Protein backbone atom coordinates (compact mmCIF):
# COMPACT_ATOMS: atom_id res chain seq x y z
CA UNK A 1 0.00 0.00 0.00
CA UNK A 2 1.35 3.43 -0.95
CA UNK A 3 0.46 6.70 0.71
CA UNK A 4 -0.74 9.28 -1.78
CA UNK A 5 -1.85 12.88 -2.11
CA UNK A 6 -4.19 14.34 -4.70
CA UNK A 7 -4.24 18.07 -5.44
CA UNK A 8 -7.22 18.95 -7.61
CA UNK A 9 -10.23 21.14 -6.86
CA UNK A 10 -13.44 19.12 -7.33
CA UNK A 11 -16.25 21.08 -5.66
CA UNK A 12 -18.90 18.35 -5.49
CA UNK A 13 -22.08 17.32 -7.26
CA UNK A 14 -23.56 20.06 -9.44
CA UNK A 15 -26.83 21.31 -7.94
CA UNK A 16 -27.80 23.95 -10.51
CA UNK A 17 -30.57 22.32 -12.62
CA UNK A 18 -29.77 24.54 -15.60
CA UNK A 19 -26.08 23.59 -15.60
CA UNK A 20 -26.95 19.91 -15.17
CA UNK A 21 -29.36 20.05 -18.12
CA UNK A 22 -26.77 21.75 -20.34
CA UNK A 23 -24.09 19.17 -19.54
CA UNK A 24 -26.46 16.22 -19.97
CA UNK A 25 -27.53 17.62 -23.34
CA UNK A 26 -23.89 18.06 -24.35
CA UNK A 27 -22.79 14.55 -23.33
CA UNK A 28 -25.97 12.67 -24.22
CA UNK A 29 -26.63 10.92 -20.93
CA UNK A 30 -27.92 11.61 -17.41
CA UNK A 31 -25.57 11.34 -14.43
CA UNK A 32 -27.04 11.83 -10.92
CA UNK A 33 -23.52 12.45 -9.57
CA UNK A 34 -22.44 14.90 -12.27
CA UNK A 35 -19.41 16.93 -11.25
CA UNK A 36 -16.83 19.30 -12.73
CA UNK A 37 -13.16 19.51 -11.76
CA UNK A 38 -10.36 21.88 -12.64
CA UNK A 39 -7.85 21.09 -15.39
CA UNK A 40 -4.98 21.32 -12.89
CA UNK A 41 -4.23 18.01 -11.20
CA UNK A 42 -1.34 16.47 -9.27
CA UNK A 43 -1.11 12.96 -7.83
CA UNK A 44 1.80 12.32 -5.48
CA UNK A 45 2.59 8.69 -4.63
CA UNK A 46 4.93 7.90 -1.75
CA UNK A 47 7.20 4.96 -2.45
CA UNK A 48 10.33 3.63 -4.12
CA UNK A 49 11.13 4.90 -7.61
CA UNK A 50 10.61 1.32 -8.83
CA UNK A 51 6.91 2.19 -8.72
CA UNK A 52 7.47 4.12 -11.95
CA UNK A 53 7.82 0.75 -13.68
CA UNK A 54 4.91 -0.87 -11.86
CA UNK A 55 2.67 2.17 -12.38
CA UNK A 56 3.82 3.47 -15.79
CA UNK A 57 2.29 6.93 -15.61
CA UNK A 58 5.45 8.58 -16.94
CA UNK A 59 5.36 6.35 -20.01
CA UNK A 60 1.79 7.51 -20.53
CA UNK A 61 2.95 11.13 -20.70
CA UNK A 62 1.78 12.12 -17.22
CA UNK A 63 5.16 13.08 -15.78
CA UNK A 64 3.90 16.62 -15.05
CA UNK A 65 0.92 15.33 -13.08
CA UNK A 66 1.99 12.12 -11.31
CA UNK A 67 5.03 12.08 -9.03
CA UNK A 68 6.60 9.14 -7.22
CA UNK A 69 8.69 10.22 -4.23
CA UNK A 70 10.11 8.54 -1.11
CA UNK A 71 8.70 11.39 1.01
CA UNK A 72 5.49 13.19 0.07
CA UNK A 73 5.45 15.44 3.16
CA UNK A 74 6.85 18.51 1.29
CA UNK A 75 4.05 18.22 -1.29
CA UNK A 76 1.46 17.84 1.47
CA UNK A 77 2.77 20.81 3.43
CA UNK A 78 2.82 22.98 0.29
CA UNK A 79 -0.77 22.08 -0.58
CA UNK A 80 -2.21 22.33 2.94
CA UNK A 81 -0.48 25.58 3.91
CA UNK A 82 -0.87 27.43 0.59
CA UNK A 83 -3.91 26.15 -1.34
CA UNK A 84 -6.05 24.93 1.55
CA UNK A 85 -4.78 27.66 3.85
CA UNK A 86 -5.86 30.28 1.33
CA UNK A 87 -9.36 28.85 1.24
CA UNK A 88 -9.86 28.77 4.99
CA UNK A 89 -8.04 32.07 5.35
CA UNK A 90 -10.47 34.17 3.30
CA UNK A 91 -13.75 32.34 2.58
CA UNK A 92 -15.47 32.85 5.95
CA UNK A 93 -15.09 36.61 5.92
CA UNK A 94 -15.89 36.70 2.21
CA UNK A 95 -19.15 34.87 2.83
CA UNK A 96 -20.13 37.33 5.54
CA UNK A 97 -19.34 40.12 3.06
CA UNK A 98 -21.95 38.72 0.66
CA UNK A 99 -19.93 36.47 -1.66
CA UNK A 100 -21.03 32.94 -2.50
CA UNK A 101 -18.42 31.36 -4.81
CA UNK A 102 -14.64 31.46 -4.90
CA UNK A 103 -14.33 32.83 -8.43
CA UNK A 104 -16.25 36.00 -7.58
CA UNK A 105 -13.87 36.61 -4.67
CA UNK A 106 -10.95 36.62 -7.10
CA UNK A 107 -12.61 39.51 -8.97
CA UNK A 108 -12.65 41.67 -5.84
CA UNK A 109 -9.45 43.70 -5.31
CA UNK A 110 -9.73 43.68 -1.53
CA UNK A 111 -10.22 39.94 -1.08
CA UNK A 112 -7.64 39.09 -3.73
CA UNK A 113 -5.14 41.50 -2.19
CA UNK A 114 -5.78 40.07 1.26
CA UNK A 115 -5.31 36.49 0.05
CA UNK A 116 -2.12 37.27 -1.85
CA UNK A 117 -0.61 39.19 1.06
CA UNK A 118 -1.41 36.31 3.41
CA UNK A 119 0.21 33.77 1.09
CA UNK A 120 3.22 35.70 -0.17
CA UNK A 121 4.16 37.59 3.01
CA UNK A 122 2.97 35.34 5.84
CA UNK A 123 2.80 31.73 4.63
CA UNK A 124 5.36 31.08 1.88
CA UNK A 125 8.37 32.79 3.56
CA UNK A 126 8.20 30.55 6.63
CA UNK A 127 7.85 27.24 4.77
CA UNK A 128 11.03 25.09 4.96
CA UNK A 129 10.63 24.23 1.28
CA UNK A 130 12.05 25.50 -2.01
CA UNK A 131 10.95 29.14 -2.04
CA UNK A 132 10.80 29.51 -5.83
CA UNK A 133 8.61 26.43 -6.07
CA UNK A 134 6.30 27.69 -3.31
CA UNK A 135 6.02 31.13 -4.92
CA UNK A 136 5.05 29.57 -8.25
CA UNK A 137 2.51 27.35 -6.50
CA UNK A 138 1.06 30.35 -4.65
CA UNK A 139 0.92 32.43 -7.84
CA UNK A 140 -1.06 29.65 -9.53
CA UNK A 141 -3.67 29.69 -6.75
CA UNK A 142 -5.31 32.83 -8.12
CA UNK A 143 -5.72 31.25 -11.57
CA UNK A 144 -7.05 28.02 -10.07
CA UNK A 145 -9.58 29.87 -7.91
CA UNK A 146 -10.60 31.99 -10.92
CA UNK A 147 -11.59 28.94 -12.99
CA UNK A 148 -14.68 29.95 -15.05
CA UNK A 149 -15.96 26.36 -15.15
CA UNK A 150 -15.90 25.58 -11.42
CA UNK A 151 -18.51 27.17 -9.15
CA UNK A 152 -16.84 26.41 -5.82
CA UNK A 153 -19.27 27.44 -3.10
CA UNK A 154 -17.88 29.17 -0.02
CA UNK A 155 -20.34 27.31 2.20
CA UNK A 156 -18.96 24.02 0.91
CA UNK A 157 -15.45 25.09 1.89
CA UNK A 158 -16.70 26.23 5.32
CA UNK A 159 -17.38 22.63 6.41
CA UNK A 160 -15.46 21.85 9.63
CA UNK A 161 -13.64 25.18 9.63
CA UNK A 162 -12.51 24.76 13.24
CA UNK A 163 -10.29 21.77 12.52
CA UNK A 164 -9.37 23.28 9.15
CA UNK A 165 -8.06 26.51 10.67
CA UNK A 166 -6.12 24.46 13.21
CA UNK A 167 -4.53 22.25 10.52
CA UNK A 168 -4.15 24.72 7.66
CA UNK A 169 -3.60 28.16 9.19
CA UNK A 170 -2.53 27.80 12.81
CA UNK A 171 0.88 26.21 12.01
CA UNK A 172 1.75 29.08 9.65
CA UNK A 173 0.45 31.57 12.22
CA UNK A 174 2.61 30.19 15.05
CA UNK A 175 5.71 29.65 12.90
CA UNK A 176 5.47 33.21 11.56
CA UNK A 177 5.45 34.55 15.12
CA UNK A 178 8.38 32.34 16.08
CA UNK A 179 10.39 33.62 13.12
CA UNK A 180 9.37 37.28 13.12
CA UNK A 181 8.44 38.03 16.73
CA UNK A 182 5.12 39.63 15.81
CA UNK A 183 1.59 38.69 14.75
CA UNK A 184 0.94 38.06 11.04
CA UNK A 185 -1.70 40.62 10.03
CA UNK A 186 -3.82 38.55 7.65
CA UNK A 187 -3.64 35.21 9.46
CA UNK A 188 -4.59 37.01 12.68
CA UNK A 189 -7.59 38.53 10.90
CA UNK A 190 -8.58 35.13 9.51
CA UNK A 191 -9.10 33.86 13.05
CA UNK A 192 -11.41 36.77 13.86
CA UNK A 193 -13.30 36.07 10.63
CA UNK A 194 -13.67 32.44 11.72
CA UNK A 195 -15.19 33.50 15.05
CA UNK A 196 -17.44 36.02 13.29
CA UNK A 197 -18.74 33.38 10.89
CA UNK A 198 -19.52 30.96 13.72
CA UNK A 199 -21.24 33.56 15.91
CA UNK A 200 -23.01 35.83 13.43
CA UNK A 201 -26.61 36.39 14.52
CA UNK A 202 -27.17 32.80 15.71
CA UNK A 203 -30.76 31.69 15.13
CA UNK A 204 -30.84 28.14 16.44
CA UNK A 205 -28.98 24.86 16.83
CA UNK A 206 -30.76 21.95 15.17
CA UNK A 207 -29.98 18.47 13.84
CA UNK A 208 -28.45 19.90 10.66
CA UNK A 209 -26.12 22.36 12.36
CA UNK A 210 -25.83 25.86 13.78
CA UNK A 211 -28.10 28.27 11.93
CA UNK A 212 -26.78 31.83 11.62
CA UNK A 213 -27.78 34.84 9.54
CA UNK A 214 -25.54 37.16 7.51
CA UNK A 215 -26.02 40.82 6.63
CA UNK A 216 -27.17 39.86 3.12
CA UNK A 217 -30.33 38.57 4.80
CA UNK A 218 -30.13 34.82 4.29
CA UNK A 219 -29.65 32.16 6.92
CA UNK A 220 -26.75 29.72 6.65
CA UNK A 221 -26.11 26.46 8.46
CA UNK A 222 -22.67 25.71 9.86
CA UNK A 223 -21.52 22.09 9.79
CA UNK A 224 -18.84 21.09 12.29
CA UNK A 225 -18.23 18.74 15.21
CA UNK A 226 -21.21 18.80 17.52
CA UNK A 227 -19.22 20.02 20.51
CA UNK A 228 -18.06 23.04 18.48
CA UNK A 229 -21.60 23.96 17.47
CA UNK A 230 -22.87 23.51 21.03
CA UNK A 231 -20.04 25.72 22.29
CA UNK A 232 -20.90 28.62 20.00
CA UNK A 233 -24.61 28.26 20.68
CA UNK A 234 -23.93 28.39 24.42
CA UNK A 235 -21.89 31.58 23.98
CA UNK A 236 -24.24 33.33 21.55
CA UNK A 237 -25.06 36.11 24.02
CA UNK A 238 -21.45 36.82 25.05
CA UNK A 239 -19.93 40.22 24.44
CA UNK A 240 -16.91 40.24 22.13
CA UNK A 241 -14.10 40.07 24.75
CA UNK A 242 -15.86 37.25 26.62
CA UNK A 243 -16.50 35.27 23.43
CA UNK A 244 -12.93 35.67 22.15
CA UNK A 245 -11.49 34.57 25.49
CA UNK A 246 -13.77 31.53 25.62
CA UNK A 247 -12.83 30.49 22.08
CA UNK A 248 -9.10 30.95 22.60
CA UNK A 249 -9.00 29.04 25.88
CA UNK A 250 -10.91 26.06 24.45
CA UNK A 251 -8.03 23.61 24.23
CA UNK A 252 -10.28 20.90 22.80
CA UNK A 253 -10.52 23.03 19.67
CA UNK A 254 -6.92 24.20 19.39
CA UNK A 255 -4.82 21.78 21.42
CA UNK A 256 -3.49 24.70 23.44
CA UNK A 257 -4.49 27.96 25.13
CA UNK A 258 -4.20 30.60 22.40
CA UNK A 259 -4.43 33.46 24.90
CA UNK A 260 -0.80 32.68 25.71
CA UNK A 261 0.22 33.97 22.27
CA UNK A 262 1.33 37.52 23.06
CA UNK A 263 -1.09 40.14 21.74
CA UNK A 264 -3.34 37.65 19.95
CA UNK A 265 -6.36 38.00 22.22
CA UNK A 266 -6.30 41.80 22.10
CA UNK A 267 -5.85 41.81 18.32
CA UNK A 268 -8.73 39.38 17.84
CA UNK A 269 -11.07 41.45 20.01
CA UNK A 270 -10.17 44.49 17.90
CA UNK A 271 -10.59 42.60 14.61
CA UNK A 272 -13.87 40.96 15.57
CA UNK A 273 -15.22 44.34 16.69
CA UNK A 274 -14.27 45.78 13.30
CA UNK A 275 -16.02 42.94 11.47
CA UNK A 276 -19.16 43.30 13.60
CA UNK A 277 -19.31 47.09 13.30
CA UNK A 278 -18.06 47.79 9.76
CA UNK A 279 -18.23 44.42 8.01
CA UNK A 280 -15.74 41.81 6.88
CA UNK A 281 -14.77 43.74 3.76
CA UNK A 282 -13.64 46.72 5.83
CA UNK A 283 -11.73 44.33 8.07
CA UNK A 284 -9.92 42.72 5.14
CA UNK A 285 -9.16 46.14 3.67
CA UNK A 286 -7.56 47.19 6.97
CA UNK A 287 -4.97 44.45 6.46
CA UNK A 288 -3.69 45.87 3.18
Give the role of each language-model region.
Residues 1-288:
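Substrate/ligand-engaging "lid" and interaction regions
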